[in-house]
Structures are given as C-alpha cells and as structure tokens.
C-alpha cells in the first residue's frame, strides 16, 4: 500500500535521487510524501495498479505449504502481517495494534486489531479474525512439517514436531482471548517482533480450513490431506483472505488479477488498489523487454541478454539503476555425512558410484582443508556475471549467510564483544552487530554498510 507507481518509466538518475532521499528521511515518516512531491515536480503522473510478471503457475494457494518464491509471491497479496516494515524501515502495526514483552523477554502478548474479518475470493464474509487464527496457523505449519522459524523460537514446538506430545496446547502459541495472542519463546530474542513479517506468523481461519476438509493433529491432517474432500489451497477460490487484495482471476500461464479487498482493515487509506501479473517465462527476451518499455509491466531485472538489448536500444544509460539488494541468500552446501545414494521415497535413481568412490568422496568432504579450497576456488563474481554481467556481478555478493537486514533490535541491547560491554540501540540491524564483532576480531571482512 506504500508503493509509488508512475505511468512513466522513472529515469535512472531519479531512481538514485529517491534512494538518497529515503536514506536521508529514514524514520521521519515523510519519505512517501516527499518522493511524490519530487516525482510530481519532475513531470511524472501516477496510477494505483501495479503490474509485474510471473514465471510459473502456483503449485498451491496454501501460503504455509508454499515452497517457492513464485508461490509465495502470488499468494502474498491476499494476506497481511501482524507488524511489517514501512518504506522507511520502521516497524508498523498491521493486523495487530500493539504488543508487550514480559520482564524475562520470553513472552510476547499481542493485541489484535478489532473489527477485522475473513472473506472469500468474492469478498463475502466468512468469519471474524480472532487470535485463535494464529494458533491454527502455527499448528497447521507443524502438521505440514514446515515450520522452521516457529521451531527455532517457539517453546514446545520441537516436542510437538517430534511426536513427544500430540497436545498442541503445550506449544507456546495461545489465544488468551479473541483479540489477545501470546507467543512464548524458548529463550529471549530481542529481535522477535521483526520476525513477525515472515509467513510463519500469518493467520489461518480455523473454521474455514476445517470446512475445506482440513484437520489438526499430524496424523489427522495426513489422513485428511489424502482425501478428495481436502480442498484448502487448491486454487484462489479455496482460501480465506484477510489481506489487502482479492484474487479475482487466475488464468494459467496468462494472467493473475487482484482487486482491493474493501473489507481490509486499512482499505480506506490504500493507495494501491490493484495488482496484475502477466505470464512471462523470459524465453522471448525481446517481448519481455518491450513489455516493460511500453508500460505493460513496471519492473525489469537486467540479465546479460536484457543488458545487451538495453545498451543496443539506448535505454541502459537512461533507465538503468542498481536496486536494493534483497533479503534472500543463495548458497552451496556440503553433504558431509552422506548416507543415502538413491531417492529416499522409492529407491529410484541410484548413484552410479562404487563403494570405493563413495568412501573417497566422503573422506574428502570431511576434510576442512578440502572444503576451504573449494570455497576459495569458486569465484562468486564470475558466477553471478553469467546472469547479470560483469558490471553488476559484485553487487549481490554477500559475506554472511543471513542478510544484514534480516532482523533488527526492538530495544537497546548490551552484549560482550571481546571483553567490552557494547550497547546497541533499538533499531540496530543484525548486520551492524556482526560487523562490530568482526572489526573487534580484526578479521578484515566487510558484511555491513550503513548506507
């Protein structure tokens, strides 16, 4: 809802000015207004519908079963978070109004915004939003065996996942009353509130889920999911919606259309009133490029092919700019103790290696020097250049697995850095703390830049 959408392509120099303006006004609450004023002065006009592309049909409309960025991106507009960062990086209340933290830092009591409702894809009321919807969501994720974030933080979740208990009331997600939600953590995490804009902390309408053939309990859910009567998340017409948009049309490999949910809690103040995705698998480079230039779509990432096309047509110097690096990292893993050499489910696709070759590979991978040699031998810049070209290759290189903007402190925190008590104020990003420790260790590695 805080998107600024122009009818014209914004020039690269104006994009750079907007980025500098945002950095200057961070935390003041005035960036959106000032950005609109600047763009208006530059002759830009505005619209309220955002158009982008999708590369594949969603495999599910159950946000908690979504395992790809494509699925999550398509389902995302139909949900809203308890809290979320605004355009200036300030955490703002959304479906929640406020929160309190216990003295020991392990219990977060969250007040849910009253008057919110669940609707179907046509905007018809299904039920009131209550705190129990977050309890239902947590259990559904556990039943799906897909709750990494919850298991890391929430007390009792591990015991439920492993089957040590089947009683979900022992897990630290509780509805104190209809509008009071409570999370109990395994241990204090001063950045916990900043995690609440992750999908793991979205709600699920319990009554609607059950009406679509769902069930709670790991064994019960597995049985229900296998039945033809299980319909939840099979398409956009079989989910309950609490977010800003209704998906009114989904045409496979063609288009997806969203309109404003008039029952959304902040609909009256929404400046973004529509979203449309058009299909593009990027196989036709010229078409994808021309769609952007002609205003059919509003964003275009440059890979090596598009970069060359932009330079040929004289658009690169005019429109290109380097956007903010995202919050997702991609990495290589070593399988140090490989035990399986075929598909676990059915034994298909067995490895062709001999037992001797398997033994040699295992020994090599357990050698730290071998692993380091591979790590140093791989040029991340050269790898990225294959997709984005030499000029932009190093822009996306990170030296930490977890992005520096992953979480930020909700309160002042003092920690020990090599024997010195060091206080970081509320609002400090994770990356700044890591950099402070690295600097104290004289490591000489850059992982965080305040800019």
Name these PLM-found stretches.
Residues 1-10, 87, 113-146, 244-387, ...:
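Extracytoplasmic/periplasmic ligand-capture domains
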Residues 1-51, 85-92, 435, 442-448:
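N-terminal hydrophobic or amphipathic helices and topogenic motifs
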Residues 32-35, 50-104, 240:
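N-terminal lobe/hinge region of extracytoplasmic solute-binding protein
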Residues 41-51, 241, 268-273, 368:
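Immediate post-signal peptide segment of exported/extracytoplasmic ligand-binding proteins
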Residues 50, 54-75, 95, 122-127, ...:
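A structural "hinge/loop" feature
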Residues 54-58, 187-189, 301-307, 387-390:
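Beta->alpha turn/N-cap motifs
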Residues 87, 188-189, 197-276:
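Gly/Pro-rich hinge or "lid" segments in bacterial periplasmic/extracellular proteins
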Residues 111, 133, 143-221:
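Surface-exposed binding/hinge segments that line
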């Amino acid at each position: 809802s805080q998107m600024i959408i122009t009818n014209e392509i914004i020039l690269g120099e104006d994009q750079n000015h907007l980025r500098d303006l945002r950095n200057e006004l961070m935390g003041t609450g005035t960036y959106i207004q000032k950005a609109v004023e600047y763009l208006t002065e530059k002759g830009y006009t505005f619209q309220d519908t955002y158009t982008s592309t999708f590369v594949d049909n969603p495999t599910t409309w159950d946000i908690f079963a979504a395992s790809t960025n494509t699925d999550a991106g398509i389902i995302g507009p139909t949900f809203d978070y308890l809290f979320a960062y605004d355009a200036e990086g300030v955490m703002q209340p959304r479906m929640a109004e406020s929160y309190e933290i216990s003295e020991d830092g392990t219990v977060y009591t969250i007040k849910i915004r009253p008057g919110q409702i669940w609707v179907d894809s046509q905007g018809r009321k299904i039920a009131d939003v209550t705190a129990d919807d977050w309890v239902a969501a947590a259990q559904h994720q556990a039943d799906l065996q897909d709750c990494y974030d919850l298991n890391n933080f929430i007390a009792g979740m591990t015991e439920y996942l492993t089957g040590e208990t089947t009683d979900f009331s022992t897990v630290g997600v509780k509805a104190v009353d209809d509008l009071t939600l409570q999370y109990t953590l395994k241990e204090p995490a001063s950045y916990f509130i900043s995690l609440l804009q992750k999908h793991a902390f979205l709600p699920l309408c319990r009554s609607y889920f059950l009406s679509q053939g769902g069930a709670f309990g790991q064994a019960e859910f597995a049985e229900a999911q296998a039945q033809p009567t299980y319909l939840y998340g099979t398409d956009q017409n079989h989910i309950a919606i609490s977010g800003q948009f209704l998906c009114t049309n989904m045409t496979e490999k063609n288009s997806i259309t969203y309109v404003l949910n008039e029952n959304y809690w902040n609909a009256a103040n929404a400046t973004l009133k529509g979203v449309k995705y058009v299909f593009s698998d990027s196989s036709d480079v010229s078409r994808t490029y021309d769609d952007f230039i002609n205003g059919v779509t509003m964003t275009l990432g440059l890979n090596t092919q598009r970069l060359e096309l932009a330079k040929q047509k004289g658009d690169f110097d005019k429109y290109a700019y380097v956007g903010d690096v995202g919050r997702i990292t991609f990495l290589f893993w070593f399988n140090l103790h490989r035990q399986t050499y075929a598909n676990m489910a059915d034994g298909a696709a067995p490895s062709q290696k001999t037992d001797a070759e398997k033994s040699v590979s295992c020994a090599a991978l357990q050698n730290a020097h071998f692993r380091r040699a591979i790590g140093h031998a791989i040029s991340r810049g050269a790898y990225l250049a294959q997709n984005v070209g030499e000029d932009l290759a190093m822009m996306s290189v990170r030296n930490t697995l977890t992005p520096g903007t992953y979480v930020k402190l909700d309160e002042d925190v003092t920690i020990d850095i090599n024997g010195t008590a060091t206080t970081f104020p509320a609002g400090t990003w994770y990356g700044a703390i890591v950099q402070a420790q690295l600097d104290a260790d004289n490591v000489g590695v850059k992982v965080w830049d305040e800019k």
